[in-house]
Regions:
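A nucleotide- and high-energy phosphate-metabolite-utilizing enzyme signature
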Residues: 1, 9-537
């Protein structure tokens, strides 16, 4: 208690002269404590140890901290917290040994203040599992990795504090700054799930969450150190999501088949279509999964202990896949899942049949739904159904369209998006990388328009779902000049790279308006020429 009162007094005086505060802190810590008996004597020893062999605000100055006053105040707040007060003597002794090393090694990083203050929430998270402190103390290279990463990314520091078990990844330097291949991911998943009983669904879901968190840490570390460019970052995050979806489908299907048996039909099959960022191979760290579930063979029933018609089976399967992907477990959740792009949106069925999807896309879908179809891929499911869905996508994209009506519909949708955005944020001095004129959405809309307008004459426009390769295809077909395609591609990559960097700092995807002004004006000029009226709003 005396220790906490002393530190509270110290924190209140941090606004005074640094030398005076440091000296006063050391004097206060050294005051005798009003305790008695062996336990009290041991507490006194631990409390006295919390002066950390002379560690003070001035020692942070000597270690190279640029904002020693603020950093020392953060340390004082940490020491004055209920977390530290509740520690058992062993945990306090471990903290006593660890914190000076933390301050010293943070001082050796490029950003000592950020490294120290952002690492304290992680230290707090592991205080009651203080073996982690010993682990880091005995593995200084792992501690150095921790400090470097949290100093580089506030998002990553928060993630490590929320999932302190990720410290295990820091011990494996050979893999920390490299992302696993798809085959390695499959092997890792198999290895982890083999240890878990098939009937323990929550344990399987938790294992998948831990695998996902570990891989995301590796991808983020690789991006922060420059070993992965933006497209490779998105590729790896996309591969990770696909493996998780495949595994969620396998787990959910095995559970249902055990109870109801396999669906019986010549055409029986189930598939998962990815839309949006996942469909376009552009997933980022916090992206939702936009999914649509499709099945075929609705006219049969299962052959198992309990009979169920195929429609109910596949609907239940879709629901279970969503559950595995999005339910909260003690290890967290995998992803947020969004099903609103299915036929008829929120009012539509969770899973739709292939014939119903075909009718909807050819007869009822809005232009914006065909725009969304440009960025779709089948990411899991039965091969025969996947082939049928890919053929349907090509057919819909290649439908004959009156270009002026198409252009008007695309521009109207862009105007609606722009109006909604302007209503919520009307700051001329800022540039929303995604939604503002000359940003990401304008590039995506002009690409989608050109695909829908010309896929009937140029089949290669239906092959890819990502913007960069679609721009390359548009250049090859002569629909975009080479210099324009190059400029739009570079702007798109620059915008996305900035979006990722801002996300890793826990910030919204916007910058000062002047930062991308030249690129933004070029994008507006090119997209307006390719799609007259796009910039009119």
């Amino acid at each position: 208690r005396d220790l906490h009162l002393s530190i509270r007094r110290q924190r209140q005086m941090c606004i005074r002269d640094r030398r005076e505060v440091a000296a006063l802190f050391n004097d206060l810590i050294a005051e005798p404590l009003a305790t008695s008996g062996d336990d009290a004597s041991r507490d006194k020893e631990v409390a006295s140890g919390l002066s950390f062999s002379g560690l003070s605000q001035m020692s942070l100055v000597e270690l190279g901290y640029q904002h020693a006053e603020e950093s020392w105040a953060a340390v004082a707040d940490f020491l004055d917290s209920t977390w530290v007060a509740a520690l058992q003597p062993e945990g306090r002794r471990r903290l006593e040994a660890f914190l000076p090393l933390l301050c010293e090694m943070a001082g050796a990083t490029r950003e000592p203040d950020s490294a120290l203050t952002r690492s304290l929430p992680f230290v707090r998270a592991v205080c009651r599992r203080s073996a982690y402190l010993v682990l880091l103390q005995e593995n200084p290279r792992a501690l150095r990795h921790l400090l470097t990463l949290v100093a580089s990314s506030i998002w990553l520091s928060e993630r490590l504090a929320a999932r302190p078990e990720l410290v295990d990844e820091l011990l494996h330097e050979s893999t920390l700054y490299s992302a696993p291949s798809r085959d390695e991911l499959h092997a890792l998943v198999r290895q982890q799930l083999l240890r878990i009983p098939e009937e323990d669904l929550e344990a399987q879901m938790s294992a998948l969450s831990r695998i996902k968190d570990g891989v995301i840490l590796r991808v983020a570390a690789s991006e922060l150190t420059g070993t992965l460019p933006i497209m490779k970052v998105s590729d790896n995050l996309t591969f990770l999501a696909e493996v998780m979806i495949e595994q969620a489908l396998a787990v959910a299907r095995a559970e249902l088949v055990q109870r109801y048996g396999e669906p019986q039909s010549d055409r029986a099959g189930f598939a998962v279509i990815a839309y949006g960022k996942l469909g376009g191979l552009e997933l980022s760290y916090g992206s939702d999964l936009d999914l649509v579930f499709v099945f075929d063979g609705a006219d049969g029933e299962t052959a198992g202990p309990k009979v169920m018609d195929n429609t109910r089976f596949y609907t239940r399967l879709a629901q279970r896949v969503v559950h595995v992907l999005s339910a909260q477990t003690y290890a967290g959740r995998l992803y947020e899942v969004d099903l609103r792009l299915r036929p008829d949106g929120d009012s539509g069925l969770v899973a739709t049949t292939l014939p119903a999807l075909r009718r909807y896309q050819l007869e009822s879908a809005w232009v914006w739904e065909h725009q969304a179809l440009v960025r779709t891929r089948v990411v899991a499911g039965d091969l025969a159904l996947k082939t049928s869905l890919e053929a349907l996508r090509r057919e819909v994209l290649a439908m004959p369209r009156e270009q002026s009506e198409l252009a008007s519909a695309v521009c109207d949708m862009r105007d609606k998006m722009r109006a909604e955005h302007t209503a919520s944020s009307n700051r001329r001095e800022r540039f929303d990388l995604k939604r503002d004129p000359g940003g990401i959405v304008d590039i995506e809309f002009v690409v989608q328009y050109l695909v829908l307008a010309h896929a009937g004459e140029h089949a290669e426009l239906t092959v890819w779902s990502d913007v960069i390769r679609l721009l390359e295809a548009l250049e090859r077909t002569g629909l975009i000049a080479a210099n324009e395609a190059k400029m739009l591609s570079q702007a798109y990559l620059d915008y996305r790279s900035a979006t990722h960097s801002l996300g890793l700092q826990g910030r919204a995807a916007e910058t000062d308006a002047a930062e991308f002004e030249a690129q933004r004006q070029q994008v507006k000029q090119i997209t307006e020429a390719l799609l007259p009226g796009l910039q009119a709003g």
